[in-house]
Amino acid sequence: MNNLKKLDGKKIALIGGAGFIGHNLAVHLQSLGAKVNIIDGMQVNNLLSLVDNVDNLPYPDLSRAIINERTQILKTAKIHIRVQDARDYHALSRLLNEINPQIIIQLAAVSHANRSNKDPYSTFDHSFRTLENSLDWARSNISSLEQFIFFSSSMVYGNFKKNIVDENEVCDPLGIYGTLKYSGE
């Protein structure tokens, strides 16, 4: 818990942070006193992509309610959402220079396995290119950046051979998504 107290006042950039994990993480970090900025191109796995496709979802009314609730939660928490495609290195760099984060949390990815396998080029671009750009900025700003956190996935382990899996298990990534997460590690 002491490490969490050290987040008070820290500037944190969540790249690809408008999805399910990102918006929840942003709210929690903000509640711990961090100054959170979400950077997201709003193209996959996030609120805006849900809004654009809500009528095609199995439960459109429920989906609308979820979207409205997420939006209200972020608004109430006063979390800044910067709409920026992290695949654009120069634009991302300008935005990160403006924010000057002490911590970067890299969440950007196409996380839906079927979508990832259907369009591997786009998946690579949204998952790996964004990581490359974020790491390149981090390398250039190593004196001010305290931490770079990459969110991976259990997909790097493939089909679990036992109930509990930890970092000592052999990696056997599943599909494009799992392979790109493993490559990112």
Name each model feature, range by range.
Residues 1-185:
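N-terminal Rossmann-like NAD(P)+-binding domain of SDR-like oxidoreductases, especially those catalyzing
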